[in-house]
Amino acid sequence: MKVVTFGEVLLRFSKRDDYRLTQGAQMEAHFGGSEANAAVSLAMLGNEVRYVSCLPETAMGKACEQRLREMGLNTRFINWGGPRIGTYFFEQAASLRPSRVVYDRKDSAFYNLHPGMIPWRDVFRGADVFHCS
């Protein structure tokens, strides 16, 4: 099946060992986001997946694209521009404390996408399914 996914890649920062965001100095970083996660899962199941998004033309943006390609995604339709990747900070639940997520997405590369920047006819050519959320 040929799938097109459209959405923002996010850079997730999380603490280790059930620490709160305010505790300790170290964080782990991973690329993700709902559409990126769905796209990778679909690719791992053997589908041909085109990932449509926007990334900053920085070392971090290039690292993100490389990781998406390593996971089997076609990144041909990623736009380049904007100042940064949207981020979120994740605090794992512990004991009676619930998980917590803090988003920082304003002025991300994806936030700066505008009509006409994506060649949708080319994106959807031959596609069977479209996923976005």
Report each predicted region and the residues it spans:
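Glycine-rich phosphate/adenosyl-contacting loop at the front of the ribokinase-like
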Residues: 1-73, 110-116
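Conserved N-terminal subdomain of the carbohydrate kinase-like
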Residues: 48-132
